[in-house]
Amino acid sequence: MDFIKTKRMPIEIATHQFDEITYDVDHLKVKALMMTPYSKVNRIVVYLRGGKGQVGRVRAARLMQFANEQTLVVGPYYRGNNGSEGKDEFYRGDLNDVTELIRILHSKYPNAFIHMIGFSRGGLQGLLTFQDLPVDSYIIWGGVSD
């Protein structure tokens, strides 16, 4: 379990490195933006974005809001978005994009606490996935439900 590809991004801050990672989900190459601290990773925050397509896309500034010097922060783009293969699927295949990413992170950083933050669409994604994952906490932020 690992990333297929890691591409360094041209974003410079003193405490973290930014990479666009690619990982395999359902035989598709799915991408995410990840900021990894230069120091030991003690905590992981998985930011599940809202919106569809380019609306609500994952941005470095949003990830930076959740970081400290020992926190890895990652936001999956979801299939069909920002160079990820496949078709954007609300609450179907995109759930697998989240679960596989968390499984990879847990295998790479087994001692780190994993926290999920889901906004809008990501809020419901988190509700549908967090109970089956090695996650220590979950925050739903304005999730839509019926």
What do the PLM-derived regions correspond to, one by one?
Residues 109-120:
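Alpha/beta-hydrolase fold nucleophile elbow
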Residues 57-75:
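Short amphipathic alpha-helix adjacent to the substrate-entry channel of hydrolases
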Residues 118-128:
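Glycine-rich nucleophile elbow surrounding the catalytic serine of serine-hydrolase chemistry
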Residues 2-38:
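N-terminal cap/lid segment of alpha/beta-hydrolase-fold proteins
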Residues 128-146:
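Hydrolase active-site cap/lid region
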Residues 89-108:
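Alpha/beta-hydrolase active-site loop
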Residues 80-91:
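Glycine-rich "HGGG/HGxG" loop immediately N-terminal to the catalytic nucleophile
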Residues 42-51:
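Short beta-strand element of the alpha/beta-hydrolase
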